[in-house]
């Protein structure tokens, strides 16, 4: 009888195991097919391994010798600034590696509140709220703020995190053509029937280096009773006279309602994001923003690094001026050599090449010459608009800039991108 039960159990288990194995095999087949389609489309993203700290000069696994890095968001060079590193170490030692908690349980330390207050002062806003990343700040904002009675109007080339955040909310969604103020006005007219109208835009767009026309956006928002939201991830710390961002650059700091930005680019490059704006909005986000409520607090070391980075910025704008001068040096030399550089005078300098294979080949040959840049093609950018995105840092030397231009000219001629 015992043997019969064992046999019955074994027989009943066999079909279940077979079905499980069949489901796993099906999953593997689906995944391999999807991965192969990515490879076939030429959009596979490989990850080069850096074996040194981040900075203008790095070591890359598989590349001989030192490499000059021109593809980091390290606009001010603060990720390796000795005072920023020391601040992170001090905070780590005093406040520990992490909080093991969300903010509203036992995850708020004095350093979190101090940094939020410092961010609000920096942007001249009432209050600020920290998130693990700006992606979280963007996915948390719209759902918490907007209801089905409201409308959000978004630039078509906004960052993926803004797009995802808008998808999560119940507001009516309008998309206007990139930087097209006539189209935005038409959409604002159409959205007049809604309770709140929020215009959402990047301050500086990461693929093209162009800047949102905030003066015109704010004028239209005022005319049609709308609020203005700006993501300043590629502007905070270095655009504007004191690095406050595109709203300072364009003289509309008092007209932009909400700013989201990051601590993971110019402000030390560790991690973290934030929303800053009206105090009542920040209070609402603390109660309703899901990425804030259900994510661990920002680690103390990251808080310490970002706080010191802001101190350095508020003490002097010398590094901001240095980055601007080096950006101008690169752009002017590249244009004089015959390259087309997209965007305004922004440290994101897209070298427009058009052909995806050409962009990939030039980037590979640049690395062989000790210059680390990345090529971008469809679907990251439109078809026929492939480019190499060069990013300038305040800690690049003039010699670094000149060497990069020389390599571009040499490789460009080799591949027929220059005569």
UniProtKB/Swiss-Prot annotation:
Tree of life domain: Eukaryota
Q: Give residue numbers for the modification (N6-succinyllysine).
A: 45, 187, 326, 368, 383
Q: Recorded GO terms, molecular function?
A: glycine C-acetyltransferase activity; pyridoxal phosphate binding
**So what does this thing catalyse?**
glycine + acetyl-CoA = (2S)-2-amino-3-oxobutanoate + CoA
Q: Which PANTHER family match?
A: 2-AMINO-3-KETOBUTYRATE COENZYME A LIGASE, MITOCHONDRIAL (PTHR13693:SF102), CLASS II AMINOTRANSFERASE/8-AMINO-7-OXONONANOATE SYNTHASE (PTHR13693)
Any GO CC annotation of this UniProt entry: mitochondrion
The record, for NCBIfam families, names:
2am3keto_CoA, PRK06939.1
Q: What does this protein do?
A: Pyridoxal phosphate (PLP) dependent enzyme, which catalyzes the cleavage of 2-amino-3-oxobutanoate to glycine and acetyl-CoA. Catalyzes the second reaction step on the main metabolic degradation pathway for L-threonine.
Is Mitochondrion included in the keywords of this UniProt record? yes
List-wise, which residues carry N6-acetyllysine? 45, 187, 383
Q: Which UniProt keywords apply?
A: Acetylation, Acyltransferase, Mitochondrion, Nucleus, Pyridoxal phosphate, Transferase, Transit peptide
Where does it reside? Mitochondrion; Nucleus
Give the matching HAMAP family. 2am3keto_CoA_ligase
The residues that the entry says bind pyridoxal 5'-phosphate are 134-135, 206, 231-234, 262-265, 295-296
Give binding positions for substrate. 159, 389
What is the protein's name according to its record?
2-amino-3-ketobutyrate coenzyme A ligase, mitochondrial
Pfam families cross-referenced by the UniProt entry: Aminotran_1_2
What are the recorded Gene Ontology BP terms?
biosynthetic process; L-threonine catabolic process to glycine
Q: Per the annotation, which location comes first and is thus the protein's main one?
A: mitochondrion
Tell me the residues on which N6-(pyridoxal phosphate)lysine occurs: 265
Q: Which cofactor does it need?
A: pyridoxal 5'-phosphate
Q: Which gene encodes it?
A: GCAT
UniProt-listed PROSITE patterns: AA_TRANSFER_CLASS_2
